[in-house]
């Protein structure tokens, strides 16, 4: 039973383990205000961002944000966007934030795309 529990915990952490906040295309900044973490992303690429997936974990809490832009709504180079907020509850400290996927208007893609959200977006662009 312990082996199964360990496997479940390990598999649930894989997207965070394989992702990184060191994305050269989309910089994510987090700020804390009491028990709320605010995430802001900035397009650091030379091309507009069409889609992204960001995952944050703190303690046992995990949240995923995704965005796919319509034509004219792309995140232009240098622009920032509020990704979202996460209630940390009783946990304190900094969340582990991962950029799982980014897709640019020029066709460039970046990230391990380990979450279901990233896989769905990637499939959408292949059509």
Named regions from a protein language model:
Residues 3-14:
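Sec-dependent N-terminal signal peptides
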Residues 17-19:
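Boundary at the C-terminal end of the N-terminal hydrophobic targeting segment
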Residues 31-38, 96:
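Short, solvent-exposed loop/turn segments enriched in Ser/Thr/Gly
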Residues 39-48:
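Asparagine-centered strand-capping/turn motif at beta-strand->loop junctions
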Residues 46, 61-63, 78, 106-109:
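Detector for glycine-centered tight turns/loop "hinges" at secondary-structure junctions
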Residues 47-55, 65-67:
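Short, hydrophobic/aromatic beta-strand segments
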Residues 64-68, 84-127:
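Terminal connector regions
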Residues 71-80:
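Short proline/glycine- and polar residue-rich coil/turn motifs
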